[in-house]
């Protein structure tokens, strides 16, 4: 059986990247929350 997680840098960035997050109000809220918490990584590098 094939495993469910098949890593791909492209897909990772396109779905969870910083710019994708900033496109929607909800995504921007996620970034704000992570900034407030003091996260070093706000989105996917």
Swiss-Prot record:
The keyword Lipid metabolism does not apply. GO terms for biological process: translation. It comes from the Bacteria. GO terms for cellular component: ribonucleoprotein complex; ribosome. GO terms for molecular function: structural constituent of ribosome. Keywords: Ribonucleoprotein, Ribosomal protein. Pfam families: Ribosomal_L34. InterPro entries: Ribosomal_bL34, Ribosomal_bL34_CS. Coiled coil: none annotated. Gene3D superfamilies: 1.10.287.3980. Belongs to the bacterial ribosomal protein bL34 family. PANTHER family: LARGE RIBOSOMAL SUBUNIT PROTEIN BL34M (PTHR14503:SF4), MITOCHONDRIAL RIBOSOMAL PROTEIN 34 FAMILY MEMBER (PTHR14503). This is Large ribosomal subunit protein bL34. The lineage of its organism: Bacteria, Pseudomonadati, Pseudomonadota, Betaproteobacteria, Nitrosomonadales.
């Amino acid at each position: 059986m094939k495993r469910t997680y098949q890593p791909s840098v492209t897909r990772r960035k396109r779905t969870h990247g910083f710019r994708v997050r900033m496109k929607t109000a909800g995504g921007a809220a996620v970034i704000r929350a992570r900034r407030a918490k003091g996260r070093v990584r706000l989105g996917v590098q």
